[in-house]
Amino acid sequence: MVPETSDLLLEIGVEELPASFVEAALRALPELCKKRFAELRLVHGDVHAYGTPRRLTLIVEKLARHQPDLEEEVTGPPVKAAFKDGAPTKAAEAFATKLGCAIADLRRVETPKGEYLVGTRREVGQPTMAHLPAALVQMTLAIPFRKSMRWGAGTVAFGRPIQWLVALLGEEVIDLEIAGIKSGTTSRSHRFLRGPGVTPNGEVTITNAATYLDTLRAAHVIADPEERARLMRERLLSAAKEAGGVLIEDDFLIHENLSLVEEPHVIVGGYEKEFLELPERVILEVAKGHQRYFGLRSPDGSLMPNYLAVVNTAENPALIRRGNDITMRARLSDARFFYGEDTKTPLATRREKLSGIVFQKRLGTVLAKAERIERLARELGLLLMLPEPTLMAAASGAHLAKCDLVCLMVGEFPELEGEMGKAYALKQGVSPEVAAVIKEHYSPKGAGDSTAASDAGALVAMADRLDTLVGCFAIGLTPTGAADPYGLRRACLGVLRTMLDRGFDLRLTDAFRAAYDGFALVKLDLSRDDLVKKLGEFFSDRLKGLLEAKLPSDAVQACLAVVSDRPLDARARAEAIAHLDAATRAGVGEVFKRATNIAGNAPAGEPGMPADEAHPSEKAAYQAFLALRERLGHLARSGDFDGAFRDIAAFAPLLAQYFVDVMVMADDLKLRESRLRLMRAISETCGTLARLDLLGG
């Protein structure tokens, strides 16, 4: 018999929640629901969470209207504790009482831990409605907020005061109460806008979960965040077109505005053209960082003296625009003042002020760090044998790289670090190549950001991150769990991505040693060798994850087991192995696993030529190996890993047949030793390219 089901709706109406509170609640609600309903044995379909600043909503599809009966086996106390001299003890009596059965109904069961009493717990399922009030109250009060508040004389804590509750199973009201608010069918429309079916004071009746989104949409509330985001983008594009411009799209701003409005409306604002004399990025940052406004470009690509603001109402647009314009002009005026003051002083002369900023109390000031970066960038360039002009550009860029940190503009807009350094450098006559280094050395800023576009910028970017990594690791400031205050994981990935993107074939150990030497005047906790070992493991873990995002895991692990110190080399080998299909990799892995295991007992030395009477498979494998060994040496030296692994894959079936036809551990000790040497030679020769025994795992 198919159980009867109904859709569940819970809407928690609140005073305006901060955007981050809405997002956190919508992440938590479905999991809280699934967990509680699992505990109650309530079967259900899909679970959805919707929300705006004024409401958090849970919809559960096809919730069973009745619990199933429960019958489960429960293990109780050990028999030796349950009975004494044949009579039941209090332990046995308590266990029987818990299960609601007689002691005679309990069974003795032998387990690995001894003999235990076992009984059956039976529970008749109850109507779902009997459990829902308490369950929904529990879920609601379990929603995590960064900071909760109490209101009135009550003791309930929530993100913001609860204003109304709608709770329905099908079309039946679930009777519950939280903080003096009783549930019903009455929700609220948009705070300022009304629609059909909405009372003058903004009340709207919800009849069931199926029509909930449509009912609110008619009341100017877009409860589904995904729908709200789509509508916001459509209206932004439309407003930009009407203004004669092109929207500067920004997913971050869509996300930022999403939980600030219940129905997105767009207003076009503007400011004086004179402000366009500021660097474009400054204007966009003023609009984005402080106001959450979108920028506009003219069809020719130049910035327009306009912005788009997402607002929560279509009423009084002129009044809203006037207020927004006043605020935008004030912010731009501040930025123009900062820019004017900053450009009065050459960037290079600001460098000494970096001595007043502490990078890390044991590792010194930002000036000390800047000096280490300048030295290290050249060391890395020499290790990579880059041309002298690149080294000079890197050195000049590194010298200026941190100077904008003491500028007024960066003090107000930290997101513009590097960007302003580049702008000021260009304005003061620094070459474009050097100015670009100032900006590029902050790249990548995150997983979605590109790495430095020039070799000089890449050198300084790597030097900056390596200095931080080596310094922090050397004084014990390593990431622990989710805590990574110095962003060391991100810095590590930045170094690796830069090396791979620029094609820098650099040994990590050489880079670590060069960076460590820059701390000669700092008392460190780790020796250079210990630092290199510990940081090498940290990098290897990150490199593994980076490569496995695009390449088969077995190929990556096989290569990192051999060349984790050279990321570019490791990637090239893993890519070559990945060109072999999964079945081929598995076959190679299987035969080399066997060869490697056997080789562990093998003596050193050149394998002997098989005797004339040897099995053809033994002769074929031996001759093929000699040819393979010669080819692999040439292919590896030339970097032709595709050819090398193709040859190994072609050799694998011969080795597999060898194992079928030949007994390696022959009774003849001399013959056994020769065959063992062959296994060792095969394993060691091919093992210089990758741990082939790890393939196919």
Regions found by a protein language model. Name each.
Residues M1-G697:
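Amphipathic alpha-helical "coupling" segments that flank catalytic cores
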